Protein backbone atom coordinates (compact mmCIF):
# COMPACT_ATOMS: atom_id res chain seq x y z
CA UNK A 1 0.00 0.00 0.00
CA UNK A 2 1.42 3.38 -0.97
CA UNK A 3 0.54 6.09 1.52
CA UNK A 4 -0.87 9.30 0.07
CA UNK A 5 -0.02 12.68 1.54
CA UNK A 6 -3.24 14.34 2.67
CA UNK A 7 -3.69 17.97 3.52
CA UNK A 8 -2.41 18.43 7.08
CA UNK A 9 -5.33 18.28 9.52
CA UNK A 10 -6.45 21.47 11.16
CA UNK A 11 -6.63 21.56 14.96
CA UNK A 12 -10.10 20.87 16.23
CA UNK A 13 -11.44 20.90 19.77
CA UNK A 14 -14.78 19.21 20.35
CA UNK A 15 -17.44 21.88 20.98
CA UNK A 16 -19.63 21.77 24.08
CA UNK A 17 -22.44 19.25 24.10
CA UNK A 18 -25.59 20.29 22.21
CA UNK A 19 -23.84 23.17 20.45
CA UNK A 20 -23.32 23.87 16.79
CA UNK A 21 -19.83 25.18 16.11
CA UNK A 22 -19.51 27.42 13.13
CA UNK A 23 -23.16 27.30 12.08
CA UNK A 24 -24.30 30.40 13.91
CA UNK A 25 -27.36 28.46 15.04
CA UNK A 26 -27.72 26.89 18.45
CA UNK A 27 -28.67 23.25 18.43
CA UNK A 28 -32.00 22.42 20.07
CA UNK A 29 -30.44 21.51 23.41
CA UNK A 30 -33.78 21.47 25.23
CA UNK A 31 -35.18 18.69 23.04
CA UNK A 32 -34.15 15.17 22.24
CA UNK A 33 -34.09 14.19 18.57
CA UNK A 34 -37.04 11.85 19.16
CA UNK A 35 -39.10 14.87 20.28
CA UNK A 36 -38.58 16.51 16.85
CA UNK A 37 -40.03 13.70 14.74
CA UNK A 38 -43.54 15.20 14.67
CA UNK A 39 -42.34 18.57 13.37
CA UNK A 40 -43.13 19.29 9.68
CA UNK A 41 -39.50 20.22 8.96
CA UNK A 42 -36.22 19.37 10.60
CA UNK A 43 -34.37 22.19 12.44
CA UNK A 44 -31.64 23.88 10.41
CA UNK A 45 -28.69 22.43 12.40
CA UNK A 46 -29.72 18.96 11.23
CA UNK A 47 -29.67 19.86 7.53
CA UNK A 48 -26.62 18.50 5.70
CA UNK A 49 -25.25 20.32 2.63
CA UNK A 50 -26.28 18.93 -0.74
CA UNK A 51 -22.89 17.32 -1.24
CA UNK A 52 -23.26 15.33 1.97
CA UNK A 53 -27.00 14.78 2.14
CA UNK A 54 -28.54 11.54 1.11
CA UNK A 55 -28.33 10.83 -2.64
CA UNK A 56 -30.06 7.88 -4.24
CA UNK A 57 -28.39 4.68 -3.08
CA UNK A 58 -26.88 2.19 -5.49
CA UNK A 59 -27.38 -1.57 -5.50
CA UNK A 60 -26.94 -3.45 -2.25
CA UNK A 61 -23.38 -4.17 -1.17
CA UNK A 62 -22.21 -7.65 -2.08
CA UNK A 63 -21.15 -8.78 1.37
CA UNK A 64 -20.48 -12.38 2.44
CA UNK A 65 -22.28 -13.94 5.40
CA UNK A 66 -19.48 -15.96 7.00
CA UNK A 67 -20.23 -19.01 9.14
CA UNK A 68 -17.87 -18.58 12.09
CA UNK A 69 -19.14 -21.78 13.65
CA UNK A 70 -16.51 -23.59 11.59
CA UNK A 71 -13.90 -22.38 14.08
CA UNK A 72 -15.65 -24.38 16.79
CA UNK A 73 -16.40 -27.37 14.59
CA UNK A 74 -12.89 -27.82 13.21
CA UNK A 75 -14.22 -28.15 9.65
CA UNK A 76 -11.06 -27.71 7.55
CA UNK A 77 -12.88 -27.06 4.28
CA UNK A 78 -15.29 -24.68 6.01
CA UNK A 79 -12.36 -22.82 7.55
CA UNK A 80 -10.69 -22.37 4.17
CA UNK A 81 -13.94 -21.09 2.67
CA UNK A 82 -14.57 -18.68 5.57
CA UNK A 83 -10.99 -17.35 5.45
CA UNK A 84 -11.24 -16.76 1.70
CA UNK A 85 -14.57 -14.90 2.11
CA UNK A 86 -13.13 -12.66 4.81
CA UNK A 87 -9.93 -11.98 2.87
CA UNK A 88 -11.82 -10.91 -0.26
CA UNK A 89 -14.23 -8.65 1.63
CA UNK A 90 -11.63 -7.02 3.89
CA UNK A 91 -9.20 -6.32 1.07
CA UNK A 92 -11.99 -4.57 -0.86
CA UNK A 93 -14.14 -2.66 1.62
CA UNK A 94 -13.61 -4.12 5.10
CA UNK A 95 -17.19 -5.31 5.72
CA UNK A 96 -18.69 -8.77 6.15
CA UNK A 97 -21.43 -10.42 8.20
CA UNK A 98 -21.15 -13.41 10.53
CA UNK A 99 -23.64 -16.15 11.31
CA UNK A 100 -23.49 -19.05 13.79
CA UNK A 101 -21.61 -16.68 16.07
CA UNK A 102 -22.80 -18.18 19.34
CA UNK A 103 -24.39 -15.01 20.76
CA UNK A 104 -27.64 -15.94 22.48
CA UNK A 105 -30.61 -14.72 20.41
CA UNK A 106 -32.69 -13.91 23.49
CA UNK A 107 -29.83 -11.82 24.89
CA UNK A 108 -29.51 -9.91 21.61
CA UNK A 109 -33.25 -9.16 21.62
CA UNK A 110 -33.08 -8.04 25.25
CA UNK A 111 -30.20 -5.68 24.43
CA UNK A 112 -32.14 -4.12 21.53
CA UNK A 113 -35.26 -3.84 23.70
CA UNK A 114 -33.21 -2.23 26.45
CA UNK A 115 -32.12 0.45 23.99
CA UNK A 116 -35.77 1.12 23.11
CA UNK A 117 -36.69 1.36 26.79
CA UNK A 118 -33.89 3.82 27.51
CA UNK A 119 -34.46 6.13 24.55
CA UNK A 120 -38.20 6.31 25.26
CA UNK A 121 -37.53 7.76 28.70
CA UNK A 122 -38.29 11.46 29.30
CA UNK A 123 -35.35 13.65 28.34
CA UNK A 124 -34.71 14.67 31.95
CA UNK A 125 -34.13 11.03 32.90
CA UNK A 126 -31.88 10.34 29.93
CA UNK A 127 -29.80 13.40 30.71
CA UNK A 128 -28.88 11.92 34.08
CA UNK A 129 -26.41 9.93 31.99
CA UNK A 130 -25.36 12.94 29.92
CA UNK A 131 -21.99 12.46 28.27
CA UNK A 132 -19.24 14.91 29.14
CA UNK A 133 -17.24 15.95 26.03
CA UNK A 134 -13.95 14.12 25.82
CA UNK A 135 -15.23 11.07 27.71
CA UNK A 136 -16.55 7.75 26.42
CA UNK A 137 -19.60 7.04 28.53
CA UNK A 138 -22.96 8.75 28.49
CA UNK A 139 -26.04 9.87 26.61
CA UNK A 140 -26.03 12.32 23.72
CA UNK A 141 -28.78 13.74 21.59
CA UNK A 142 -27.50 14.31 18.03
CA UNK A 143 -23.93 13.33 19.08
CA UNK A 144 -23.17 17.04 18.77
CA UNK A 145 -19.65 16.82 20.14
CA UNK A 146 -18.51 14.92 17.04
CA UNK A 147 -20.52 16.33 14.15
CA UNK A 148 -20.96 19.92 15.29
CA UNK A 149 -22.12 21.88 12.25
CA UNK A 150 -24.14 19.04 10.70
CA UNK A 151 -26.04 17.28 13.46
CA UNK A 152 -26.96 13.62 12.92
CA UNK A 153 -30.56 12.52 13.40
CA UNK A 154 -29.95 10.16 16.31
CA UNK A 155 -29.47 9.66 20.01
CA UNK A 156 -26.78 7.48 21.57
CA UNK A 157 -25.89 5.87 24.86
CA UNK A 158 -22.24 4.78 25.20
CA UNK A 159 -20.28 3.05 27.93
CA UNK A 160 -16.90 1.43 28.33
CA UNK A 161 -16.22 -2.25 28.90
CA UNK A 162 -13.25 -4.29 30.00
CA UNK A 163 -13.17 -7.67 31.67
CA UNK A 164 -10.08 -7.11 33.82
CA UNK A 165 -11.93 -5.39 36.66
CA UNK A 166 -13.04 -7.28 39.75
CA UNK A 167 -16.49 -5.69 39.50
CA UNK A 168 -18.84 -5.78 36.47
CA UNK A 169 -18.12 -2.31 35.05
CA UNK A 170 -21.16 -2.06 32.77
CA UNK A 171 -23.69 -3.19 35.37
CA UNK A 172 -22.14 -0.82 37.90
CA UNK A 173 -22.31 2.06 35.40
CA UNK A 174 -26.06 1.69 34.92
CA UNK A 175 -26.77 1.42 38.65
CA UNK A 176 -24.52 4.30 39.67
CA UNK A 177 -25.52 6.65 36.84
CA UNK A 178 -29.22 5.93 36.35
CA UNK A 179 -30.16 4.38 39.68
CA UNK A 180 -31.01 0.94 41.09
CA UNK A 181 -34.11 0.60 38.90
CA UNK A 182 -31.75 0.23 35.92
CA UNK A 183 -29.75 -2.63 37.47
CA UNK A 184 -31.54 -5.28 35.33
CA UNK A 185 -30.73 -3.31 32.16
CA UNK A 186 -27.13 -3.04 33.30
CA UNK A 187 -26.90 -6.80 33.79
CA UNK A 188 -28.21 -7.38 30.25
CA UNK A 189 -25.54 -5.11 28.74
CA UNK A 190 -22.82 -6.56 30.98
CA UNK A 191 -23.59 -10.02 29.63
CA UNK A 192 -23.95 -8.73 26.07
CA UNK A 193 -20.52 -7.03 26.21
CA UNK A 194 -18.95 -10.21 27.58
CA UNK A 195 -20.33 -12.17 24.62
CA UNK A 196 -19.21 -9.45 22.19
CA UNK A 197 -15.69 -9.64 23.61
CA UNK A 198 -15.59 -13.40 23.10
CA UNK A 199 -16.97 -13.06 19.56
CA UNK A 200 -14.37 -10.39 18.76
CA UNK A 201 -11.56 -12.76 19.76
CA UNK A 202 -13.09 -15.48 17.58
CA UNK A 203 -13.12 -13.06 14.67
CA UNK A 204 -9.47 -12.25 15.37
CA UNK A 205 -8.67 -15.93 14.86
CA UNK A 206 -10.48 -15.82 11.53
CA UNK A 207 -8.57 -12.69 10.52
CA UNK A 208 -5.29 -14.43 11.37
CA UNK A 209 -6.22 -17.34 9.11
CA UNK A 210 -7.34 -15.06 6.29
CA UNK A 211 -4.09 -13.05 6.38
CA UNK A 212 -1.87 -16.09 6.84
CA UNK A 213 -0.07 -14.56 9.83
CA UNK A 214 1.15 -16.12 13.07
CA UNK A 215 -1.66 -17.98 14.87
CA UNK A 216 -2.65 -16.31 18.11
CA UNK A 217 -1.03 -12.93 17.35
CA UNK A 218 -4.25 -10.89 17.14
CA UNK A 219 -6.17 -12.89 19.73
CA UNK A 220 -3.40 -12.37 22.27
CA UNK A 221 -3.05 -8.69 21.30
CA UNK A 222 -6.70 -8.04 22.21
CA UNK A 223 -7.00 -10.48 25.12
CA UNK A 224 -6.75 -7.64 27.68
CA UNK A 225 -8.40 -5.02 25.51
CA UNK A 226 -10.80 -2.23 26.38
CA UNK A 227 -13.94 -1.69 24.36
CA UNK A 228 -16.74 0.80 23.82
CA UNK A 229 -20.39 -0.17 23.57
CA UNK A 230 -22.81 2.22 21.87
CA UNK A 231 -26.59 1.99 21.60
CA UNK A 232 -27.91 3.99 18.64
CA UNK A 233 -31.48 5.22 18.21
CA UNK A 234 -32.66 6.78 14.93
CA UNK A 235 -36.19 8.22 15.24
CA UNK A 236 -38.45 8.61 12.19
CA UNK A 237 -37.55 11.83 10.38
CA UNK A 238 -39.95 14.22 8.59
CA UNK A 239 -37.30 15.04 5.94
CA UNK A 240 -34.94 12.05 5.73
CA UNK A 241 -33.49 13.18 2.40
CA UNK A 242 -32.06 16.34 4.03
CA UNK A 243 -30.13 14.76 6.90
CA UNK A 244 -28.19 11.68 7.99
CA UNK A 245 -28.44 9.41 10.99
CA UNK A 246 -24.65 9.17 11.17
CA UNK A 247 -22.34 11.12 8.90
CA UNK A 248 -19.69 9.48 6.69
CA UNK A 249 -16.81 8.24 8.82
CA UNK A 250 -14.23 5.52 9.35
CA UNK A 251 -13.97 3.85 12.74
CA UNK A 252 -10.62 4.59 14.43
CA UNK A 253 -11.00 1.43 16.52
CA UNK A 254 -9.81 -2.05 15.53
CA UNK A 255 -13.07 -3.86 14.87
CA UNK A 256 -16.77 -3.06 15.06
CA UNK A 257 -19.51 -5.62 15.67
CA UNK A 258 -22.90 -4.19 14.72
CA UNK A 259 -26.26 -5.69 15.63
CA UNK A 260 -29.04 -4.14 13.55
CA UNK A 261 -32.77 -4.47 14.07
CA UNK A 262 -34.89 -5.25 11.01
CA UNK A 263 -34.87 -1.66 9.72
CA UNK A 264 -32.07 -0.97 7.25
CA UNK A 265 -29.94 2.16 7.29
CA UNK A 266 -26.25 1.23 7.14
CA UNK A 267 -24.48 2.20 3.90
CA UNK A 268 -20.85 1.70 2.80
CA UNK A 269 -18.97 3.81 0.23
CA UNK A 270 -17.58 1.50 -2.47
CA UNK A 271 -16.24 2.76 -5.81
CA UNK A 272 -17.81 6.17 -5.24
CA UNK A 273 -21.32 4.81 -4.54
CA UNK A 274 -23.18 4.42 -1.27
CA UNK A 275 -24.20 0.76 -1.06
CA UNK A 276 -26.86 -0.29 1.48
CA UNK A 277 -26.37 -3.22 3.84
CA UNK A 278 -29.67 -4.95 4.57
CA UNK A 279 -30.07 -6.70 7.93
CA UNK A 280 -29.74 -10.49 7.79
CA UNK A 281 -31.77 -12.23 10.51
CA UNK A 282 -29.46 -13.70 13.13
CA UNK A 283 -26.30 -12.21 11.59
CA UNK A 284 -24.04 -9.41 12.78
CA UNK A 285 -22.10 -6.92 10.66
CA UNK A 286 -18.32 -6.77 11.12
CA UNK A 287 -16.16 -3.94 9.86
CA UNK A 288 -12.45 -3.25 9.98
CA UNK A 289 -11.33 -0.04 11.71
CA UNK A 290 -8.23 2.11 11.29
CA UNK A 291 -6.34 0.34 14.07
CA UNK A 292 -6.70 -3.07 12.48
CA UNK A 293 -5.84 -1.58 9.09
CA UNK A 294 -2.47 -0.73 10.67
CA UNK A 295 -2.25 -4.16 12.32
CA UNK A 296 -2.72 -5.76 8.89
CA UNK A 297 -0.07 -3.40 7.44
CA UNK A 298 -2.68 -1.87 5.14
CA UNK A 299 -3.84 -5.12 3.57
CA UNK A 300 -7.33 -4.83 5.05
CA UNK A 301 -9.34 -1.65 4.55
CA UNK A 302 -11.13 0.72 6.88
CA UNK A 303 -13.82 2.27 4.68
CA UNK A 304 -16.25 5.15 4.91
CA UNK A 305 -19.75 4.25 6.04
CA UNK A 306 -22.82 6.10 7.27
CA UNK A 307 -26.39 5.62 8.48
CA UNK A 308 -29.47 7.00 6.72
CA UNK A 309 -32.90 7.51 8.27
CA UNK A 310 -36.46 7.12 7.06
CA UNK A 311 -39.82 8.79 7.54
CA UNK A 312 -41.83 5.89 8.93
CA UNK A 313 -39.90 3.61 11.26
CA UNK A 314 -37.49 4.06 14.14
CA UNK A 315 -34.23 2.15 13.91
CA UNK A 316 -32.01 0.72 16.63
CA UNK A 317 -28.50 -0.68 16.42
CA UNK A 318 -25.86 -1.80 18.90
CA UNK A 319 -22.20 -1.19 18.06
CA UNK A 320 -19.38 -2.87 19.97
CA UNK A 321 -16.01 -1.25 19.25
CA UNK A 322 -12.96 -3.37 20.04
CA UNK A 323 -9.95 -1.28 21.10
CA UNK A 324 -6.46 -2.22 22.26
CA UNK A 325 -5.29 -1.49 25.76
CA UNK A 326 -4.18 2.15 25.77
CA UNK A 327 -0.47 1.39 26.14
CA UNK A 328 -0.35 -1.48 23.65
CA UNK A 329 2.03 -0.82 20.76
CA UNK A 330 0.17 -1.28 17.48
CA UNK A 331 2.36 -3.03 14.92
CA UNK A 332 1.66 -5.81 12.41
CA UNK A 333 2.89 -9.35 13.06
CA UNK A 334 6.45 -10.00 11.85
CA UNK A 335 5.32 -12.02 8.83
CA UNK A 336 3.25 -9.08 7.54
CA UNK A 337 5.56 -6.20 8.48
CA UNK A 338 8.01 -5.99 5.56
CA UNK A 339 8.02 -3.19 4.70
CA UNK A 340 5.98 -1.69 7.54
CA UNK A 341 3.70 1.02 6.12
CA UNK A 342 2.71 2.73 9.38
CA UNK A 343 4.94 3.61 12.34
CA UNK A 344 4.40 1.95 15.70
CA UNK A 345 1.82 3.75 17.82
CA UNK A 346 -0.40 3.20 20.84
CA UNK A 347 -4.17 3.39 21.03
CA UNK A 348 -3.74 6.39 23.35
CA UNK A 349 -1.76 8.16 20.57
CA UNK A 350 -4.51 7.56 18.01
CA UNK A 351 -7.27 8.63 20.38
CA UNK A 352 -5.40 11.84 21.15
CA UNK A 353 -5.04 12.52 17.43
CA UNK A 354 -8.70 11.90 16.58
CA UNK A 355 -9.85 14.12 19.44
CA UNK A 356 -7.62 16.99 18.33
CA UNK A 357 -7.73 16.60 14.55
CA UNK A 358 -10.90 14.71 13.67
CA UNK A 359 -10.95 13.64 10.03
CA UNK A 360 -13.95 11.78 8.64
CA UNK A 361 -12.17 10.37 5.62
CA UNK A 362 -10.21 7.38 4.40
CA UNK A 363 -6.77 8.95 4.95
CA UNK A 364 -6.89 9.06 8.73
CA UNK A 365 -3.90 6.75 9.14
CA UNK A 366 -1.82 8.73 6.67
CA UNK A 367 -2.65 12.00 8.43
CA UNK A 368 -1.93 10.34 11.78
CA UNK A 369 1.44 9.11 10.49
CA UNK A 370 2.39 12.66 9.49
CA UNK A 371 1.29 13.88 12.91
CA UNK A 372 3.48 11.27 14.63
CA UNK A 373 6.51 11.93 12.42
CA UNK A 374 6.27 15.34 10.73
CA UNK A 375 8.64 16.24 7.87
CA UNK A 376 12.14 17.25 8.94
CA UNK A 377 11.55 20.97 8.34
CA UNK A 378 8.42 20.93 10.49
CA UNK A 379 10.20 18.96 13.20
CA UNK A 380 13.08 21.47 13.23
CA UNK A 381 10.69 24.40 13.50
CA UNK A 382 8.83 22.69 16.34
CA UNK A 383 12.13 22.04 18.14
CA UNK A 384 13.11 25.73 17.80
CA UNK A 385 9.78 26.85 19.25
CA UNK A 386 10.08 24.42 22.14
CA UNK A 387 13.67 25.54 22.81
CA UNK A 388 12.63 29.20 22.90
CA UNK A 389 9.70 28.62 25.24
Curated annotation (Swiss-Prot):
GO MF term (any one): dioxygenase activity
GO BP term, pick one: response to light stimulus
Active-site residues per Swiss-Prot or TrEMBL entry: 315
SUPFAM superfamilies the record matches: Clavaminate synthase-like
Top enzyme class: oxidoreductase
Bias kind Pro residues: ranges: 1-17
Fe2OG dioxygenase domain ranges (all copies): 224-324
Catalyzed reactions: gibberellin A12 + 2 2-oxoglutarate + 3 O2 + H(+) = gibberellin A9 + 2 succinate + 3 CO2 + 2 H2O; gibberellin A53 + 2 2-oxoglutarate + 3 O2 + H(+) = gibberellin A20 + 2 succinate + 3 CO2 + 2 H2O
Region (Disordered): 1-23
Keywords: Iron, Metal-binding, Oxidoreductase
Role played: Contributes to the promotion of internode elongation in response to submergence via ethylene and gibberellin signalings.
Protein name, UniProt field: Gibberellin 20 oxidase 2
Organism the protein comes from: Oryza sativa subsp. japonica
